[in-house]
């Protein structure tokens, strides 16, 4: 039986047609859902892949790390050979260099190295994903409040059928609640109560120790009417108020127990650097708990008024002063009783804080190297109150010492110099002439700047 042309075409279409893949993923498997990383973020991370030993913050790089980074950049970006001797410094000193400093040290590749370093600094900034979609077991909100829970069982209990009361008790670990609050340990946040008659009086303590239920956390963050300041971050460490999972249905809420427990609050004072609080499970924390009731607080059978409740809130606060680690201040280069440049250079060479600017290459032979010419010029400018001092201007003063055979430039070496005399020998000579030459040089610079 012959087929009509229309039937043949329909048959061919059926054979060649393949149904498209369903855009809806299958949830039959028990594997967790992986959210793909945005393409722009993935491209930014894949654009520069440093070696494993260089993936620390550049501020922690050693001198060898800086040399290896230069070698890697030279190969990665097909740059001209870079003289690593011009970058003999650690990561801290590398971050002090400006773009002009990079160009001065490496005329052909300095701008690329500077932009590469800035890109690495941006790439090393921590990224925080605030969406709870990435962590179904945790509840992470943005600015209003951040609540971190170490236990994932509580959220899973929402979907389970209720068990007998004996099985419903779970001894969960303490929760850590990090909230944005004002300077005062007593918060002024008052959420509207569903029934004002049942809740005649709500102290700030009740709002402060209030913990979100899993059903409330699933609804996302709520808008806050309070003023969120960044100066203070109260951190409350407390046991769970309710050690049982709520019922799976929200239409039958359980009445709250008549007795609740207050929390012990550890409040971190404002500090430039916030250190993490490490809770060691081996050392138990003794929380002195006071019993609260919904219809008015009672303690030993006597009612407690509002002032006592505020005192209770203050008693349950532990003020922890978090101070940043001691860091050496950036040297500004001012040295007392030091007028001449050669003496100033000797003083800097004797101080280890200035090794990123100038250092001894061979102390016995009195050979020194200027590591950061522009930085050294800025230090000399601060010392002489010349904010526009440059290395070119400072090198003019150095040339006077060439003529007097005090300092000599090493032949064939860049930024390498040698003292031809000891400080005692220099002081025994005519220092008044040196002072006159240097002051004359500064006066000429000021005159030229005024002319411009």
Swiss-Prot record:
Database matches in InterPro entries: Ets_dom, ETS_fam, Pointed_dom, SAM/pointed_sf, WH-like_DNA-bd_sf, WH_DNA-bd_sf
Post-translational modification as stated in the protein's UniProt record: Phosphorylation of Ser-257 by MAPK14 (p38) inhibits ETV6 transcriptional repression.
Chain positions of site Breakpoint for translocation to form CHIC2-ETV6 in AML: 11-12
Organism field: Homo sapiens (Human)
Highest rank taxon of the organism: Eukaryota
Impact reported for residue 214 to L: In THC5; abrogates DNA binding; alters subcellular location; decreases transcriptional repression in a dominant-negative fashion
Positions where N6-acetyllysine occurs in the chain: 11, 302
Pfam families reported for this sequence: Ets, SAM_PNT
Site, as annotated: Breakpoint for translocation to form ETV6-MDS2 in MDS: 54-55
Gene: ETV6
Annotated keywords: Acetylation, Chromosomal rearrangement, Disease variant, DNA-binding, Isopeptide bond, Nucleus, Phosphoprotein, Proto-oncogene, Repressor, Transcription, Transcription regulation, Ubl conjugation
Span of the signal peptide: none
PROSITE patterns: ETS_DOMAIN_2, ETS_DOMAIN_3, PNT
Oxidoreductase listed as a keyword: no
Site feature (Breakpoint for translocation to form ETV6-AML1 in ALL) residues: 336-337
Related illness: A chromosomal aberration involving ETV6 is found in a form of chronic myelomonocytic leukemia (CMML). Translocation t(5;12)(q33;p13) with PDGFRB. It is characterized by abnormal clonal myeloid proliferation and by progression to acute myelogenous leukemia (AML).
GO terms under cellular component: chromatin; cytosol; nucleolus; nucleus; plasma membrane
Annotated protein name in UniProt: Transcription factor ETV6
Residue ranges: DNA binding: 339-420
